[in-house]
């Protein structure tokens, strides 16, 4: 729940900035910032978390089952973003309206999928996302294996088997202490901060083009690299902080969960908002942006599939982000 709240309010800022940019007709900036947020969370945030956490704890673990489910969801997001662009590139005579209709239909599907993932993680299969429960189940499974071995020895030395068997029994009276959840005040603080950001976002959007020209940067680099890093700095710091506290499950849920929410919620909502604001917003991204997203998803899935991380894996993610950032910087 903590990771979901952090991701939701963090992406609320992203959504507000994107809505203001969309209202001003800056469609290229909106799409670039969406692509950059996905790339930044998967490579920069997760890379920093694994690298700094790995330097302190040598090796850290998180739930591989959740990592694989997140990987499948990200693969779906890549497919959903790729197909409208692929159709536009491979078919002739496709107008803006047809592209918008396809993007709207895809947006509805993605929002529905995200709703189902919330139902899966918070209702029907909560035990898979509870780190404490998962660890306990792993210990029980190991205990069952050890118990079988002890019983085999017990056929030869019953006395010894009994003493070891008793050690494997779990005291039913031992229950984890429950602490009251006082999250309501903090939700209010996050909500107030989000509202404050809404007022400041308009000034950011208005000064974006002028600042880009003064710094001599191309719009693609600004939208994909600079804007997401600045807009999600607090969320990035939280994920890294959790890794430094050896809470890698929460760190991964913030990094990957944020990317999923952007791909499955924020982007579709912006497509639907385009109809209301009278802007031709669709999911037809630049091919180079899609290649960068696909590369980010591929390397992140490869590294996180085993549910274990170290500083070298974090360094690999950071190196991939640096290569992509340089590519966007020199992109004409």
Model-derived features with residue positions:
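Alpha-helical transmembrane bundles of multi-pass secondary active transporters
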Residues: 28, 42-206, 281, 285, ...
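Generic hydrophobic-segment detector
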Residues: 4, 8, 26, 30-31, ...
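Long, well-ordered mid-to-C-terminal structural blocks that present hydrophobic/aromatic surfaces
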Residues: 193-234, 238
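A long, glycine-enriched binding/interface module in the latter
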Residues: 273-274, 285-287
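Helix-loop-helix junctions within the multi-pass membrane cores of secondary transporters/permeases
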Residues: 2-54, 222-279, 295
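Hydrophobic, well-ordered secondary-structure elements that form the walls
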Residues: 212, 260, 321
